[in-house]
């Protein structure tokens, strides 16, 4: 189904930033569970956790090996490394897609059973993209063109990364229809779609093309999904709005950090709070 394109703005993004009241506490402000990072990509665990924490979630629960937990705690000592109730899940950043290639292989993952037991809104990134359409809860996936080409081809829709890059608006809608999930297709112009909504983000700063920026986006998105979890469960399209807002915030944080110069993922994270403050003042 072809949708009308909605161009996302700062005003739209600000609506997805939940500000706490005097009655809030860390649990009511949203708890994000993360299953991210690996021995091959330990930085993903650090970056997703730090980005989520900087975006204003009430608590981050990190689930992985003790070695990765020590790395995470060195950068984000406020992270909790014990399992417990969460409002949203972020799964897959920095995890090998070849090792966990489908639902059956994910069933062998130590922590995946918690994702199934706590059926809350879930973000699937990188190594968890193969789970798209397999979970009962509201789900958003965050592929780039190559990952989406692999995912769609595995589902019988043969397409190349080059074809997706040539017409991302078409293929993000195709993916949403084929997979039955909300899709955030990363690129110089990012698109978000479900089977009703199509959102176009402003062109991103080229400095955002740096290692770890996808992990930062995943962390921002995880925090926003956790803080908007009730709204997402009550409004089908809210997950798409939150996904678009995460991409908007990431780009604005990158612009602020860069000021026309090169940046890294850590600099983007450091700029998130000031970026949120500016959006909330609009």
What spans do the regions from the language model cover?
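A conserved hydrophobic position in a structured secondary element of the catalytic/binding core
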Residues: 64, 124, 143
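Small-residue (G/A/S/T)-rich helix-start motifs and N-terminal tracts that mark the onset
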Residues: 1-121, 130-137, 150-282
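Non-cysteine beta-strand/loop elements that form the S-adenosyl-L-methionine
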Residues: 138-146
């Amino acid at each position: 189904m072809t949708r009308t394109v909605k161009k996302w703005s700062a005003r739209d993004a600000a609506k997805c930033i939940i500000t706490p009241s005097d009655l809030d506490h860390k649990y009511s402000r949203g708890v994000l569970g993360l299953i991210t990072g690996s021995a091959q990509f330990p930085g993903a665990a650090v970056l997703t956790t730090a980005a989520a924490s900087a975006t204003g979630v009430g608590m981050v629960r990190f689930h992985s090996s003790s070695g990765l937990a020590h790395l995470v705690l060195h950068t984000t000592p406020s992270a909790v490394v014990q399992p417990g109730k969460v409002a949203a899940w972020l799964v897959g950043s920095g995890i090998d897609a070849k090792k966990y290639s489908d639902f059956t292989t994910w069933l062998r993952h130590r922590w995946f059973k918690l994702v199934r037991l706590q059926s809350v809104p879930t973000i699937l990134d990188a190594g968890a993209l193969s789970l798209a359409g397999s979970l009962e809860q509201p789900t958003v996936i965050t592929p780039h063109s190559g990952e989406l080409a692999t995912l769609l081809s595995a589902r019988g829709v043969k397409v190349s990364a080059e074809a997706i890059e040539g017409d991302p608006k078409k293929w993000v809608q195709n993916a949403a229809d084929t997979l039955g999930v909300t899709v955030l297709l990363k690129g110089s112009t990012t698109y978000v779609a479900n089977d009703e909504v199509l959102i176009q983000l402003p062109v991103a700063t080229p400095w955002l093309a740096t290692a770890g920026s996808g992990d930062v986006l995943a962390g921002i998105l995880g925090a926003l999904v956790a803080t908007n979890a009730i709204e997402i469960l009550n409004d089908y399209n809210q997950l798409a709005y939150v996904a678009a807002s995460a991409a908007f915030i990431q780009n604005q944080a990158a612009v602020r950090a860069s000021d026309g110069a090169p940046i890294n993922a850590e600099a983007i994270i450091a700029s998130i709070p000031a970026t949120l403050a500016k959006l909330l003042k609009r």
